[in-house]
A protein has these predicted regions:
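Catalytic phosphate/metal-binding cores of nucleic-acid and nucleotide-processing enzymes, i.e., regions
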Residues: 1-97
């Protein structure tokens, strides 16, 4: 499954659209997600951001040995995207252990 977390952009063909971090995390917990593409700003920061998904994946890798999917960041928020990409690099490093 390919998961696309975004509140505004059109969903690419063949992707499953979610709007909130908890929806993405629920799908990740199934183990069926092969690729996930994350936006940061989702319209309501009190409801969470794409970075919350990065944090969940990182913790799941460390605590439970979760095998992360391929992770893409497509956020227009450049500083948040940089932070998310740094998180992806950390996840990749941890997953190789």
């Amino acid at each position: 499954m390919r998961v696309f977390l975004d509140d505004e952009r059109p969903t690419p063909e063949g992707w499953h659209r979610v709007y909130w971090p908890e929806e993405a995390i629920q799908l990740l917990e199934t183990g069926a997600v092969e690729e996930i593409s994350l936006d940061h700003d989702l319209g309501d920061d009190t409801h969470g951001t794409g970075y919350d998904v990065i944090l969940w994946i990182e913790e799941a890798v460390v605590v439970r040995g979760f095998k992360p999917p391929h992770i893409c960041v497509h956020s227009a928020n450049s500083s948040a995207a940089d932070k998310m990409r740094a998180g992806v690099q950390t996840i990749q490093r941890l997953a190789r252990r």
